[in-house]
Swiss-Prot record:
Subunit: Heteromultimer composed of HisG and HisZ subunits.
Keywords: Amino-acid biosynthesis, Cytoplasm, Histidine biosynthesis
Organism the protein comes from: Methylobacillus flagellatus (strain ATCC 51484 / DSM 6875 / VKM B-1610 / KT)
Family: Belongs to the class-II aminoacyl-tRNA synthetase family. HisZ subfamily.
Protein name: ATP phosphoribosyltransferase regulatory subunit
Pfam families hit by this protein: tRNA-synt_His (PF13393)
InterPro entries referenced in this protein's UniProt entry, alphabetically: aa-tRNA-synth_II/BPL/LPL (IPR045864), HisRS-like_core (IPR041715), HisRS/HisZ (IPR004516), HisZ (IPR004517)
Keyword Amino-acid biosynthesis: yes
GO BP terms in the entry: L-histidine biosynthetic process
Highest taxon above the source species: Bacteria
Function as written in the Swiss-Prot or TrEMBL entry: Required for the first step of histidine biosynthesis. May allow the feedback regulation of ATP phosphoribosyltransferase activity by histidine.
Protein's cellular compartments: Cytoplasm
Principal location: cytoplasm
Amino acid sequence: MRNWLLPEYIEDVLPAEAARVEQLRRSLLDLFKVHGYLYVIPPMMEYMESLTTGIGHDLDIATFKVVDQLTGKLMGIRADITPQTARIDAHMLNNQGVTRLCYAGSVLRTSPDGLARSREPLHVGAELYGHAGVESDIEIQRLMIKALHTVGLDTLYIDVSHVGIFASLLEHAGIGEAQEQELYAALQSKDQAAVRALGRGLNPDTLEALSSLTELSGDISVLEQAAKRLPQTEKIQQALRDLKAVGAGLDDLDVKVCFDLAELRGYHYHSGIVFAAYAQGYAGPLARGGRYDEVGAIFGRARPATGFSLDLRGVVSSLPVAETVGAIFAPAIADDALIFVVESLRAQGQVVIQDLPGQEPYRAELGCDRILVQQNGEWVVVAAPEL
């Protein structure tokens, strides 16, 4: 085995891309800060009980597991930061009102995930705890849209659904977990024939409603159709009212909102509105999120919660190559005036690379497009000839 090889779907981030990732990470955290979201840095590793309990089987499978050499207990390397922020809100901060948290950190997954098909995505996200109303769902989605605009994505499509509709339809259906999973899979693939076949033993009205979910997709007008075709229960009608409020709450933004009532991503994890952001020319969701009101229960407090996250490395790898800004080359001369100019330029945010003895043959590798030269006794910056 060659010592420089990395595991599959694990890779280095080289200087140009790393600089862009870090610049955007800072910009996103600054965006979250001015919206009142407090930055937290959860640990890379925790006991498995806190990382995956209450989140569902999928996250357990995605988590790398190790044995703690100090205690002998099973630990996991985080595959998702959301459960960690839920723990911080419920157990560490213990606020009674609304808490807004944000984060930016790498996660490790057993299988590749996200736009870049990486097992080590860089998750950046925001979570809002302590408010159950649709207003907080709207706030989080608006923040997600601003975040994607910040990284340079303009033409956005927001796909919105509500897992509570499917859950409400099955609430009194009396079906087993296996049949529920099969219905879920059929709806995800919009296979209406499979839905009807799987639901033969259900109440005819329930089956008709489940089948209609595969057709209820489109702009905000589809919610009016849904209100007529779905049962007139308070839970379902309230879910539709909440979705309509989301459409109105995003109406002033330059995005296209689509409602897809068969979209049930995270059904066993989310408890209400779910959403994902797409952009023209990009395969797969750029960011996703939703409401997950029960996750904090395992930590002692089941607080209302909603949030979103994006894989910043994946997003950056999909963006057009950025134009690089060259550095300024400074000769290796012991001159107080030169040192003063170099430090002044650096204080302004300019990149100045001071030459070192013996490096003349390699100056072209520095990427400098300007050079400090002495003219009339003063050091000035001019366009660099071939170094």
